[in-house]
Amino acid sequence: MEFFDVKKMPVNLWRNGAGETREICCYPPSRDFNWRASIASLASNGEFNVVPQVDRVVTLLDGGEVTLLGGGAFRHTLKRHQPFTFAGEHPVRAELTDGRMSLDFNLMTRRDRCRAQVRVADRTFTTGRARGGIVYVLSGAWQLNDKLLTPEQGAWWQEGSHTLRLLKAEGQVLFSEITYL
């Protein structure tokens, strides 16, 4: 299991200048990954990279709403904490709905190898026995193993079942499970 704090992660600027990315994990660590998770800041309208044979799940974490224009395939406005899935083959343009910067959680999976499910939890839970997983704290204080996690912190793992405990009356965590085909 690997723990992370978004505030301490390296920042990579996008080539088109529209935003920046903080990579949470890439498994296995190569261009031919099975799954990859990151946090992205979108500062202006811009194009997403086309990634053939990859499914993408994007979740708005904070900031202004973002409308994704997927050519003739879809038009979708991201709402806070509501995951949206689309195929990486689609050329996608992101437009800031009200001009405010947004912060997004992004999860990409190789379609022929694995699938991802992303959801928000608001109570103590135990993960399934998926082959990979990620948690990202949205609010509250949570305990994973012996580690305290607070907003903008999280963890990822390759295998196993793990219990995430909510330590306060209220809190939310973004949770992803990776299953292999």
Swiss-Prot record:
Organism superkingdom: Bacteria
InterPro entries: RmlC-like_jellyroll, RmlC_Cupin_sf, Uncharacterised_HutD/Ves, Uncharacterised_Ves
Family matches, as CDD domains: cupin_HutD_N
Family the UniProt entry places it in: Belongs to the Ves family.
Record NCBIfam families: PRK11396.1
Annotated protein name in UniProt: Protein Ves
Organism (species): Cronobacter sakazakii (strain ATCC BAA-894) (Enterobacter sakazakii)
Gene (name only): ves
